[in-house]
């Protein structure tokens, strides 16, 4: 993950209710738990014992953050989440949500870490998170992802067996893009954001929103809809059974 600053507000939604936003950040991150994966071998981690080979290196795990990957700063009187990106992982709400409107604002920092020194900065909003931490690449829970990456905010990624239906079209056999009005297709791999896209330059604040209701979700960037997913669900590894995924952390 490569996000520097992140402001979070959440609202629960009802069929005929106006949203009431609830701040999700405080200085102690009291509404969240941390999970961190395997630190890159290019730097030392206090108190961390590596395995005999890179594949045997253990995860840092739950609420163990010796490098302060996740901290809160106060900017203009408001708590702002600072993520260094030095270790892949996630910050997960303690509470589960089903129907909600999540509104975030973020801007990028300048520093990068191995293994992404030459890659674009990358993060994501993962929602409907269920199951065990680390199910996806030792870093994330099973979930749906709204990608927050430089140049690709609003792409959809499935984590640990998640899948959806979406209105998409193929581009050049390489890109599957969200296209409003296109036929729905069952998807288990990346869906690129739509062409109505307006990301702000690095260093400026972008507003990213996720609306989730009854298993569907809408991703918006700076007031524009960039992706829509339908019928959130998942499959266990090796199974063809599809299980509804409408709520989670």
Language model feature labels by segment:
Residues 1-2, 223:
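N-terminal export leaders
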Residues 16-249:
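Carbohydrate-interacting regions of secretory-pathway proteins
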Residues 2-14:
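Sec-dependent N-terminal signal peptides
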